[in-house]
Structures are given as C-alpha cells and as structure tokens.
C-alpha cells in the first residue's frame, strides 16, 4: 500500500472515530503510531473512494484482538461491519489464528447483537470498567470468537 493512500485511509478512520466515539476517539497520530507496530493492522471498507468502515486489530501468536471497529454513521446498518468481519475472519484463519477477542461496553446493545450474530460469546465481564463523568460506571464485556471450535464443528 503506498504511503499517500495509507495516510488518507488513516485520516478517514480518525474522522469516523470522532463521529462515532466523540469522548473516546483515537487520533490520527495515535493510529499512525499503533500501525508502526508489526502486530497491528488495519482493514478498511470503501464505498466508491470513501472509507466507510474500519477494523484495527492486533495479532499475538495464535490469538487476535479487535482494538477498534466502526462504521461511518451514514453507512451503518448496511452490512459494512459484516463485510469487515468476513474479511478479518478469512485473513486470521489463513494465519492459523485460533481465537479473536474484543471488548465492548455492556450498554452497547446493537454492537453486542452484531458480535453475537458473528459467533462471539461473552467470556468475562469487567465490573464498572467504563467511567463517564456524572454517570454510573458501565461494565465491559470481553467477547471471544473461537475459530478452533468452529473448524472442529464444521470439519
């Protein structure tokens, strides 16, 4: 991927972050710094020439973790996240990754429903993990998609 293309993609991801997570958005520079690590990669979905969705993930040996995933608000509920998961699952399984982890706010019911639809299961709950000023703390759910079990069941 050429540098100009990558920079514009990262800028678009940072812009989407600001739209969908204004209090917790990761900046362009944070994304650039993370992507300098060999274990971290970025998938993007385009519509025409526009970045409409992204997934930032990290691989560590036989396990991967989604660090950030998002879809531009104008393109939500159009299957963008499912396309991201399909591509990510294909890449990770080709690399013999056994499981994929993610963390989600327990009050983010649309995201949880999507993750469950993709085959993720809740494996842990962090009580009061997300703290927001003037609001009660929200739990974090750790969810896992186990490729090894999927392969065993389908094989």
What is the predicted role of each segment?
Residues 3-74, 82-87, 91, 95, ...:
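Acetyl-CoA-dependent GNAT
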Residues 32, 107, 129-130:
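Positions that flank functional sites
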Residues 40, 137-142:
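Short hydrophobic/aromatic beta-strand or adjacent loop that forms the aromatic wall/cage
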Residues 50, 69-86, 95, 99-100, ...:
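Conserved glycine-rich acetyl-CoA-binding loop
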Residues 103, 116, 121-139:
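Conserved catalytic-core motifs of GNAT/GCN5-like acyltransferases
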